[in-house]
């Protein structure tokens, strides 16, 4: 792979970190991270959404190779990818927040464009029970 950022980690640690970032992005709709990590995670997230748009069995198996949780792959294929059916790339956006207080690293929010996370019935019940 050309132009790969090493992010100060060994290959296995770097790939695991990026997989976790992408998985968290699909679970929550947005994540807060450093700008360089967000740029690398964005590359992988865009590839996964493109696989989700294909929607066939081989694409689902490719996504399962990269994403750890099966329910996140289901969410990707059934909820996230259909939102971007008519969009040709540019599924994510990076919003810069400014420097982190501890070390001054530039922070940002990586989020999915035009996607609002659906609340599951279990989450709604817990919110009602708390009130």
From Swiss-Prot:
Domain of life, source organism: Bacteria
InterPro entries reported in the protein's UniProt record: Ribosomal_bL17 (IPR000456), Ribosomal_bL17_CS (IPR047859), Ribosomal_bL17_sf (IPR036373)
Coiled-coil parts of chain: none
Keywords annotated in UniProt: Ribonucleoprotein, Ribosomal protein
GO biological process assignments: translation
Any single Gene Ontology cellular-component annotation: cytosolic large ribosomal subunit
MF terms in GO: structural constituent of ribosome
Subunit structure comment from the entry: Part of the 50S ribosomal subunit. Contacts protein L32.
Homology family: Belongs to the bacterial ribosomal protein bL17 family.
HAMAP family assigned to the protein according to its UniProt record, in alphabetical order: Ribosomal_bL17
Name recorded for this polypeptide: Large ribosomal subunit protein bL17
Protein source organism: Finegoldia magna (strain ATCC 29328 / DSM 20472 / WAL 2508) (Peptostreptococcus magnus)
Organism placement in taxonomy: Bacteria, Bacillati, Bacillota, Tissierellia, Tissierellales
């Amino acid at each position: 792979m050309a132009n790969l950022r090493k992010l100060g980690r060994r290959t296995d640690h770097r790939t695991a970190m990026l997989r976790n970032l992408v998985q968290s992005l699909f679970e929550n709709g947005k994540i807060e991270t450093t700008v360089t990590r967000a740029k690398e995670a964005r590359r992988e997230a865009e590839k996964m959404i493109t696989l989700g748009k294909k929607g066939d069995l081989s694409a689902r198996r490719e996504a399962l190779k990269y994403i750890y949780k099966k329910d996140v792959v289901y969410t990707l294929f059934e909820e996230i990818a259909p939102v971007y059916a008519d969009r040709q790339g540019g599924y994510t956006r990076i919003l810069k927040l400014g420097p982190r207080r501890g070390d001054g690293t530039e922070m940002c929010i990586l989020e999915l464009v035009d996607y609002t996370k659906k609340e599951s019935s279990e989450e709604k019940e817990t919110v009602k029970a708390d009130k």
